[in-house]
């Protein structure tokens, strides 16, 4: 087993007593198994300098010198050398030397240096007894060569601070190195503490403690008190301002008599737009003739609805991170914590829905696996983490998405996944070769169909996400054309961009894999984000095929799959948002046609790329429901219900309003709302089921003909069949029928 030295720092002391002469100097090390992303073999060691011979001291000093220029060392260390350095290898020897597995750490406390004392580090183990045995480590920065060297470099650049805007000190190097192999989460209520690979439950607990602490924490000095008073006054004003703006937006949406008159090119409207804050203009707006002008313009109502919503959203954006969290009060006001206890959500459920501040990092993901690469926690724990926090970056998504999409089994080992990757690679190449070596089909209809499929694929791929960097230029190197050779359009140009080519190859191979469905417009929208994250043709193909297992129902020729979802959404809207549902019926929009495209390709065209990654990975978890996209859509309806009900009256207005929402929606807010809506729906469904069970015995004696005839009595469910499917986590799979010459192509 090959070991790497990741970190080395000299002049790290232990202070056994108050006497300076008793201080013990030593080296702080972090070791890690080479070519491994798991931390099962990673250790933190402290070795007293007086226990080392000259050769070992020179080795460690040279390692520390390298560590100055290399943030993370990757210095191979033989097992023999490591055993020599660590001695007996026991946890704690008589000379204070210790070695602790990184896996056993619960938290680390970093105390910054000050005028009177050195900066220090305290390691807290998951075992209290072990923690008591680990000495406090003091970083004597005035003696440490690597710290002195880095400090001089920072001084030369006139930047004495680290990336966290804190004064640089030796402990920062240790924290950076440790953070490269584990996830460190700062406890906001106690900023010196950092949790190591914290569980989601720990993060939630410390988050709640932080809220309580921030409200009760006293000021430390008179000056601090003055500063805090000023901050509180400003905070109070900001909170009040946005609260008033939010209320003003509500009032405006209800009256429909102010902002709607500020549009179009009517002279009165232009005058108002330039002088809308003038007292006399405001008085003029109350004139019945001005009100009549507003009523003559349908688009005024759309403008009014969007303005009211934008003010509320701006208020909420401020309030989400404010001192007393008015955003929370907005949610409570809209959803209700009071009333019918059977269907309203609890404080804990509200807190859980709102706490989306802990995305899963690569370090956290790696910490979930043992030395064989097997998951050490339940799949539900992983999905809970992803559902409530998402994934931190694209590198983490590249590792996790194949699990979420079912390419890798959750219970597989690293060796099993390597074998699976090889098998899937071979199978993909075999499928691809079928169309690469394809001969002309003697059946003219089939040959025409194949050519049409290739034409559709190429056409859609060339138009795909051309604002995204890897798809932007249709050149072999994905760089811009020279100005004198740039084509006017891509329409008459073959695909040259290597990434676009791979999209076309994957879609063509999928045509071989699933000949009954073939290619349907919209599939490129589903494939493009997958390839952007995975960047590997074979793995992307299998992620896409598994994704299409659930999405095929959206592309069936008879449209039965998407129709079922639209019917479920209609029932859901009637149950959860009856006022909006009734108003949409008046607007001839009760079929929710404006939601069709959003559901068809999972909101791909309504949000930017980064937002889509976050939205999709939540959907992939099936944490609450395999059709969670319907609750996300319901959240969009709920969010916009008041502006719609109070300002829009026609089908065209509703369509335009929702089309104009593109790239303007806050996905985080919608995820909070969708979770609260699901909780309320689940409780409502349970309540209706209980009421139905109570009614069955009462009616059982009135008609026994069915029982006597040998059949069970029929009972009508209080919740539709479509709504019942929303409570299931099992993915609904609908396959296309066998394609024939008479099939609609």
From Swiss-Prot:
GO terms for cellular component: late endosome. One of its GO terms (molecular function) is GTPase activator activity. Disulfide bonds: none annotated. Keywords: GTPase activation. One of its GO terms (biological process) is regulation of vacuole fusion, non-autophagic. InterPro entries: Rab-GAP-TBC_dom, Rab-GAP_TBC_sf. The keyword 4Fe-4S does not apply. Residues 391-623 form the Rab-GAP TBC domain. Most effectively accelerate the intrinsic GTPase activity of YPT7. It is also active, but to a lesser extent, on YPT31, YPT32 and YPT1. YPT6 and SEC4. This is GTPase-activating protein GYP7. It comes from Candida glabrata (strain ATCC 2001 / BCRC 20586 / JCM 3761 / NBRC 0622 / NRRL Y-65 / CBS 138) (Yeast).
């Amino acid at each position: 087993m090959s070991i790497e030295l990741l970190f080395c720092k000299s002049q790290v002391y232990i202070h056994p007593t108050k006497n300076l002469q008793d201080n013990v100097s030593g080296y702080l090390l972090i070791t890690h198994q080479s070519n491994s992303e798991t931390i099962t073999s990673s250790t933190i060691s402290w070795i007293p300098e007086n226990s080392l011979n000259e050769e070992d001291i020179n080795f460690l000093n040279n390692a520390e010198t390298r560590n100055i220029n290399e943030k993370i060392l990757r210095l191979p260390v033989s097992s023999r050398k490591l055993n020599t350095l660590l001695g007996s290898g026991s946890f704690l020897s008589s000379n204070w030397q210790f070695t602790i597995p990184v896996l056993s750490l619960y938290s680390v406390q970093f105390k910054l240096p000050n005028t009177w004392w050195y900066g220090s580090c305290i390691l807290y183990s998951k075992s209290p007894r072990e923690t008591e045995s680990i000495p406090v480590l003091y970083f004597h920065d005035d003696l440490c060569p690597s710290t002195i060297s880095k400090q001089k470099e920072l001084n030369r650049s006139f930047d004495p601070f680290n990336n966290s805007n804190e004064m640089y000190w030796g402990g920062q190097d240790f924290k950076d190195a440790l953070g490269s192999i584990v996830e460190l989460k700062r406890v906001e209520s106690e900023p010196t503490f950092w949790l190591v690979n914290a569980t989601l439950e720990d993060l939630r607990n410390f988050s709640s403690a932080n809220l309580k602490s921030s409200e009760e924490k006293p000021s430390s000095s008179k000056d601090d008190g003055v500063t805090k008073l000023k901050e509180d006054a400003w905070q109070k004003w900001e909170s009040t301002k946005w609260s008033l703006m939010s209320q003003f937006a509500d009032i405006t949406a209800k009256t429909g008599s102010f902002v709607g008159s500020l549009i179009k090119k009517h002279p009165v409207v232009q005058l108002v737009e330039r002088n809308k804050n003038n007292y006399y203009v405001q008085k003029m707006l109350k004139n019945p003739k001005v009100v009549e002008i507003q009523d003559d313009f349908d688009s005024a109502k759309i403008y009014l609805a969007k303005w009211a919503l934008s003010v509320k959203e701006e208020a909420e954006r401020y309030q989400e991170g404010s001192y007393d969290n008015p955003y929370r009060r907005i949610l409570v006001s809209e959803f209700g914590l009071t009333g019918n206890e059977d269907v309203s959500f609890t404080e804990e459920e509200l807190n859980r829905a709102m706490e989306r501040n802990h995305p899963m990092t690569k370090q956290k993901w790696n910490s979930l696996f043992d030395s064989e690469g097997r998951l050490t926690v339940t799949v539900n724990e992983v999905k809970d983490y992803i559902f409530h926090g998402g994934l931190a970056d694209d590198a983490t998504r590249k590792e996790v998405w194949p699990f979420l999409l079912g390419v890798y089994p959750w219970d597989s080992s690293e060796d099993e996944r390597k074998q699976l990757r090889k098998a899937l690679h071979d199978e993909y190449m075999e499928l691809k070769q079928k169309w690469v070596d394809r001969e002309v089909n003697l059946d003219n209809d089939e040959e025409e169909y194949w050519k049409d499929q290739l034409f559709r694929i190429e056409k859609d791929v060339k138009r795909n996400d051309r604002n995204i960097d890897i798809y932007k230029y249709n050149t072999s190197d994905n760089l811009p054309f020279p100005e004198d050779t740039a084509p006017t359009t891509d329409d008459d140009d073959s695909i040259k961009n290597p990434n676009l080519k791979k999209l076309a190859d994957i879609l063509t191979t999928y045509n071989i894999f699933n000949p009954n469905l073939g290619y349907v417009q919209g599939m490129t929208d589903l494939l493009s984000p997958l390839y952007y994250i995975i960047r590997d043709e074979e793995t992307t193909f299998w992620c896409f095929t598994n994704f299409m297992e659930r999405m095929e129902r959206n592309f069936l020729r008879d449209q039965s799959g998407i129709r079922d979802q639209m019917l479920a959404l209609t029932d859901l809207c009637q149950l959860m948002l009856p006022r909006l549902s009734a108003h949409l019926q008046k607007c001839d929009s009760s079929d929710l046609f404006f939601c069709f495209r959003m559901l068809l390709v999972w909101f791909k065209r309504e949000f930017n790329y980064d937002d889509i990654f976050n939205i999709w990975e939540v959907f992939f978890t099936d944490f609450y429901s395999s059709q969670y996209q319907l609750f996300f859509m319901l959240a969009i309806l709920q969010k916009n219900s008041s502006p719609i009900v109070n300002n829009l009256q026609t089908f065209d207005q509703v369509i335009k309003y929702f089309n104009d929402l593109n790239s303007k929606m806050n996905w985080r807010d919608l995820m909070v709302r969708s979770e609260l809506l699901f909780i309320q729906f689940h409780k409502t469904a349970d309540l209706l089921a209980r009421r139905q069970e109570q009614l069955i015995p009462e009616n059982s004696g009135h008609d026994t003909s069915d029982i006597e005839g040998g059949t069970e009595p029929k009972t009508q469910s209080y919740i539709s069949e479509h709504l019942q499917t929303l409570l299931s986590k099992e993915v609904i799979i609908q396959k296309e029928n066998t394609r024939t010459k008479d099939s609609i192509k």
